[in-house]
Amino acid sequence: MLKKIERAQQLLKKEAAVFRCPTCHEPMHVEGVGLICQQRHQFDLSKKGTLYFLNHGVQTEYNKKMFTSRGKMIQSGMYAPVLNKIMHYLPQNKTVVDVGCGEGSFLAELSQAGLSGLKIGFDLSKEGIYLASNQLIDAFWCVADLTNLPFANEGLDTILNIFSPSHYQEFRRVLKDDGTVIKIIPEENYLKELRAAFYPNDEKKQSYSNQKVVQRFAEELAVEVDERITYCFDIPEERRLDLLEMSPLEWQVSQEVKAKLQQRPLEKITIDVRLLVGRKR
């Protein structure tokens, strides 16, 4: 059985043309245990088979504990109806990049549902990507910057953008002429029970609108699909504590509130999201 770094080397040899140097924007080729460009900027694979494309350190509040809980909730089926919808719009045997993939659970679930082709996940969080490298799927994982994607011009078929920021100028650059962006945006009732439990006295945190995000998407891309997906999910008993720690909502919650919820965790949660599919104009 091949080691992770050996599997990653094989993929790079086959797919090196997909990448470009994030420092000088020149093409790259495989040399040794990584990629190198004509200007000799070199990016070596880690033992886990991941690539670090940043030339600077990054501090994020997204940590291993949060990513682990998020992964368990995704694997529990919490987002299954959303992922089933996404599968309708994903091409087969093409190149798909998951932007802001975290621990890689969404890409893993889609792969298990039948997604084929070259799959790449990237995130700004090194911890998230190290966890993603443990996913039992054929995919490539890297740490990269959304504003300076390490991908060649017009080389990608689809960008997955699930609960993560967008950079449409870069998206248009790296997508093929017929390429698509599939974006999932939280709607007003998303995780409403959790927000109410975390912040019972803060109405601002219990209601919000992403209409500006939807408008921006429509300004940047030709919208082909705009669909709202809403349902209530029965949380498996063994996953109820993971729900409390799976998102940034938890960061500002008092210890007193957390303790109460750990004693009496939520049993149901509302999923309310917008599915957008846009194509380059």
Residues covered by each model-derived region:
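Conserved class I S-adenosyl-L-methionine
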Residues: 93-102
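Class I SAM-dependent methyltransferase Rossmann-like catalytic core
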Residues: 59-81
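Conserved beta-strand signature within the Rossmann-like core of class I S-adenosyl-L-methionine
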Residues: 179-189
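N-terminal auxiliary segments of SAM/dcSAM-dependent transferases
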Residues: 1-59
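Conserved SAM-binding loop of SAM-dependent methyltransferases across substrates and taxa
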Residues: 103-115
